A protein has these predicted regions:
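Short gly/pro-enriched beta-turn/loop segments at secondary-structure junctions
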Residues: 4, 52-54, 60-64
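Ferredoxin-type iron-sulfur electron-transfer modules in oxidoreductases and energy-metabolism complexes
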Residues: 26-57, 71-172
Length: 172
């Protein structure tokens, strides 16, 4: 049995492989991640905020998503640092929001949408939507999609002091 995200994968044949067995391509079944994102993007701002808060209220900060994610590979995660202390040990909506937003930004341009985070979550958070939305914005803004070419760095993994966008220099 295939995972749900495999049934709606936009790349059912891997773009990178050593050897591949030719099989009939999978037919997309059910809502794709893009369709789920579009449904939520169509919501009003207050509906989106309500949806996001509902998702954050589910989180128990067990970090199963982090442990399951092949792209979470920092030697020391910011949540495990005691000085400075980024998050309290209490499970609050505010700290859950900080945790999830920070994780989403860390995965921007790296997530390959394998779904390991959503499968690992004991509370059923729609983590694939939240990270998938960031991936969609990354592709739209930077023209970058993770996992398609070997040796390329993600859009947020590089720094160029000659970047034409002056936001980081404080100029306009």
């Amino acid at each position: 049995e295939l995972y749900e995200n495999c049934m709606s994968c936009k790349y059912p044949s891997p773009p990178i492989f050593d050897y591949i067995v030719q099989v009939e391509p999978l037919k997309v079944q059910g809502d794709t991640l893009g369709e789920r994102i579009e449904k939520i993007e169509a919501m009003s701002e207050s509906e989106k905020l309500s949806y996001f808060k509902e998702q954050m209220n589910k989180c128990i900060r067990c970090y199963a998503c982090r442990q399951a994610c092949p792209m979470c590979y920092c030697e020391t995660c910011f949540v495990d640092i005691n000085s400075p202390k980024w998050l309290s040990k209490e499970v609050t909506n505010e700290d859950n929001t900080i945790w999830n937003i920070t994780r989403i930004y860390h995965l921007a341009g790296r997530c390959v949408e394998c779904g390991a985070c959503s499968r690992a979550c004991p509370e059923g958070l729609d983590l694939m939507y939240l990270i998938g939305k960031m991936n969609r914005d990354t592709k739209r803004l930077f023209g970058f999609e993770a996992g398609l070419k070997i040796g390329t760095k993600g859009n947020l993994e590089t720094f160029n002091p000659n970047d034409p966008d002056f936001f980081w220099k404080g100029e306009s």
